[in-house]
Each structure stands twice: as C-alpha cells, then as structure tokens.
Amino acid sequence: HSSWYNRLFSNSGTICYVGLVWVLALGAILPNLFVGSLRCDPRIFSCTFAQYVSSYYTIAVVIFHFFLPIGVVSYCYLRIWVLVLNIRHRVKPDRHLHHQTWPYNIHGFITMFVVFVLFAVCWGPLNIIGLTVAIYPPLGDSIPQWLFVASYF
C-alpha cells in the first residue's frame, strides 16, 4: 500500500494531477464556446450557460456535469456504507476502544456525505429545470421567473 501511495502522491504525480484538473476544466468549458451557449441572462444579471441554445447540448451538460457525478458518488457512498456496516457487525471492539475510535472514524464519512448532499441540493434545482426545459421546450415559458432565479442562488 505504501509503495503505491508514494508513487501516486509524489511531487511529479501531484504536478500531473494539477495539470489534469486544468485540462478537464478547459475541456468542460470549451464546448460552450463552440455551441455559443454563454449568454448574458438579465434575470440573474450574469453571463451564464444559456440552456435554451441547444437541447441536446443541455441534456449532455446535465448528464455529464450533474447526474454522472451524483451517480458515481452515490455508488461509492453505498459501497463505503456497506463496508462500514459489515465491519462493524463482524468486529465487536471493547466498549472503551469503541468510544475512542468510532466518532473519529465516522466524522470524516459524515463530513464527506454532507458535502455530497450540499452539492445535490445546490445544483439539483438548476439542472433539473434545465433538463426539463431541454426535453420539453414549451414548458420553459411556464416555469416562474422567481423559481429560475432562486435555482441560481
């Protein structure tokens, strides 16, 4: 385990990871320039992704930028939770040891879970509205402006 860790998280590996993050960030934003989906939206007073430019592109953005991360993280959390439950039922630690280690072990898991829930709550409304309008464009006029604006904030 330690040899893999030392290889993956070396100085050169870290530089590669930072470079990969920048390449992925540019790869995520460049299609907007070709589709022409960056527009000034007077409802939110900002230059943002215009969901009405291309239905297919909006569907792809919602799938790759929202549902795919939600699906992957949900799968990982399910696997982690099953593993934690299986280990907890297999090993019966001493009560004193249990009280010392359990809060520290579960604290990191709960913190990551809260971050995941916040991601879903913050980005969910905007992406669900965008996906709904992309699938059925006439519905876009019936969405109240306050709901659209609230989904951005």
Swiss-Prot record:
This is Melatonin receptor type 1A X2.0. PANTHER family: B2 BRADYKININ RECEPTOR/ANGIOTENSIN II RECEPTOR, MELATONIN RECEPTOR TYPE 1A-LIKE. GO terms for molecular function: G protein-coupled receptor activity; melatonin receptor activity. GO terms for biological process: G protein-coupled receptor signaling pathway. It is found in: Cell membrane. It is a multi-pass membrane protein. High affinity receptor for melatonin. The activity of this receptor is mediated by pertussis toxin sensitive G proteins that inhibits adenylate cyclase activity. It comes from Xenopus laevis. The chain crosses the membrane at residues 13-33, 58-78, 113-133, 146-153. It comes from the Eukaryota. Coiled coil: none annotated. Residues 1-12, 79-112 are cytoplasmic. Keywords: Cell membrane, G-protein coupled receptor, Membrane, Receptor, Transducer, Transmembrane, Transmembrane helix. Belongs to the G-protein coupled receptor 1 family. GO terms for cellular component: plasma membrane. Residues 34-57, 134-145 are extracellular.
